[in-house]
Swiss-Prot record:
The protein's assembly and partners: Part of the tectonic-like complex (also named B9 complex).
Bilayer disposition of the protein: Multi-pass membrane protein
UniProt keyword Cell membrane present: yes
Protein name: Transmembrane protein 17B
Chain's gene name: Tmem17-b
GO biological process: cilium assembly; smoothened signaling pathway
Intracellular or extracellular location(s): Cell projection, Cilium membrane
Signal peptide start-end: none
Annotated organism of origin: Xenopus tropicalis (Western clawed frog)
Alphabetically ordered keywords of this record: Cell membrane, Cell projection, Cilium, Cilium biogenesis/degradation, Glycoprotein, Membrane, Transmembrane, Transmembrane helix
Transmembrane spans: 51-71, 84-104, 116-136, 147-167
UniProt function note: Transmembrane component of the tectonic-like complex, a complex localized at the transition zone of primary cilia and acting as a barrier that prevents diffusion of transmembrane proteins between the cilia and plasma membranes. Required for ciliogenesis and sonic hedgehog/SHH signaling.
Gene Ontology CC entries for this record: ciliary membrane; ciliary transition zone; MKS complex
InterPro entries reported for this sequence: Uncharacterised_TM-17
Residues carrying covalently attached carbohydrate according to the record: 26, 195, 203
Length: 219
């Protein structure tokens, strides 16, 4: 059963455009690569990423409990400014993590580019900076328990960034290629002349995203 996405249509469209611009419209490196593309659809979901998300989801409640314990121990020793800053950081991390893991699960398992792109953006722009702040700022009075759970969490984050980037790159190009080939087959079936150079995906100088927009990445 397909899971519902929490992302609005406009957000999904924007994320699809970002993914297309990053992984399809690169005319320097991508166009020079030689690949044996096939028209059939391959399974693009990543088992390592799904395993990371699964174990991350189980680990995160222990991370929250550990942070509550350490906050209770050191809260009175923090300055008023850092009490607010630390509390806000933990609340944001907790709220964003629930959304991040869900859209990462949906994006990877159901091969949805916008959700996977949103997962990567949330990881890079929110979770990773906040976690590094908690881990490196000595004025937070880092305790051994803090250090242990933060390091484990950081390993999850780093692995998910690398794997999701590679999966998103492969997924975006594959879907764009399938969409492009589908449109080419429609033109051929209607006896519309198709420029032979356009049928060679790796040598085309006009990006697929510019020709067809981000429709291929929305589903």
């Amino acid at each position: 059963m397909a899971l519902l996405t929490p992302l609005p249509g406009s957000v999904r469209h924007g994320l699809a455009r970002i993914s297309g611009s990053l992984f399809i419209q690169n005319k320097t490196r991508d166009c020079g690569e030689q690949h044996a593309y096939q028209s059939g659809h391959d399974l693009l979901s990543s088992l390592p990423l799904q395993m990371m998300l699964y174990f991350n989801a189980f680990f995160f409640p222990f991370w929250i409990i550990s942070e509550i314990i350490t906050m209770e121990l050191k809260f009175g020793r923090l300055s008023g400014y850092y009490q607010i800053l630390l509390t806000t950081s933990l609340v944001i991390l907790t709220l964003v993590e629930s959304l991040r893991l869900y859209i990462g699960y949906v994006g990877n398992l159901h091969e949805k580019v916008p959700e996977l792109a949103g997962f990567l953006i949330l990881t890079l722009l929110i979770q990773l900076p906040l976690l590094l702040f908690l881990l490196t700022d000595n004025r937070n009075l880092l305790l051994p328990l803090d250090l242990a759970v933060h390091m484990i969490y950081l390993m999850f984050i780093n692995a998910e960034i690398v794997i999701s980037f590679l999966v998103l790159k492969t997924m975006t190009r594959q879907f764009a290629l399938e969409y492009y080939l589908q449109q080419s087959e429609i033109l051929v079936s209607k006896h519309v002349p198709v420029n032979r150079t356009l049928l060679r995906f790796q040598n085309t100088t006009t990006s697929i995203a510019e020709q067809y927009g981000s429709d291929a990445l929305m589903y």
